Amino acid sequence: MLRIADKTFDSHLFTGTGKFASSQLMVESIRASGSQLVTLAMKRVDLRQHNDAILEPLIAAGVTLLPNTSGAKTAEEAIFAAHLAREALGTNWLKLEIHPDARWLLPDPIETLKAAETLVQQGFVVLPYCGADPVLCKRLEEVGCAAVMPLGAPIGSNQGLETRAMLEIIIQQATVPVVVDAGIGVPSHAAQALEMGADAVLVNTAIAIADDPVNMAKAFRLAVEAGLLARQSGPGSRSHFAHATSPLTGFLEASA
């Protein structure tokens, strides 16, 4: 069971809504993933339409919506988008995203911290997408963010946990949930994140662009479950030396 702010989730896999070939495939994949928290970009939602092709099926699916501020380049733009989301969707939950460079989509640490502090004061439950910077994640936690979402690699790159060393520090020092976001390309990456102590992962591109998104979503669900179970089972420590699993000393002496 994962608790963030005032909500609990059975699934430790969060999903996105971008890049799917159709809204039907999006919903089928989300259901197959078992995800209960789904993020959507406010820039992709037509708030003038009650039957928006993205929003309506998500509401029907009964998932918790996590609107994001993707597209915002400054704290001011993100704060404006956050208020639009709260008014339109009736939720104070927000994935804070500020990335001024459209090529790399790397989060702006200064603007993110600035916006996070303001939004928390305004009553939002803020989950910030950020770089894998232990100092920044601690600062975001201190200003009241409900979780931190450091990247594993650039958005949509499918490179995996390129920031593993920093993620380990973030996880070790955090007192709020850590959700590894961005760069997760295959289910084994998700399993590794849970094994190393992350509370959840957010996956979008790897599922949406797969040849079979529904089955890929299932694979991610199983991988996250396996990674969590492995961590809870207490894996053995790594060693530089070999350790025999079946000592042969007694057997050899008895045969002599």
Swiss-Prot record:
Protein name: Thiazole synthase
Active site (catalytic residues): 95 (schiff-base intermediate with dxp)
Subunit structure: Homotetramer. Forms heterodimers with either ThiH or ThiS.
Record-linked SUPFAM superfamilies: ThiG-like
Species, as recorded: Escherichia coli O17:K52:H18 (strain UMN026 / ExPEC)
GO biological process: thiamine diphosphate biosynthetic process
Main EC class the enzyme belongs to: transferase
Catalytic activity annotation: [ThiS sulfur-carrier protein]-C-terminal-Gly-aminoethanethioate + 2-iminoacetate + 1-deoxy-D-xylulose 5-phosphate = [ThiS sulfur-carrier protein]-C-terminal Gly-Gly + 2-[(2R,5Z)-2-carboxy-4-methylthiazol-5(2H)-ylidene]ethyl phosphate + 2 H2O + H(+)
Similarity-based family: Belongs to the ThiG family.
UniProt entry tagged with the keyword Transferase: yes
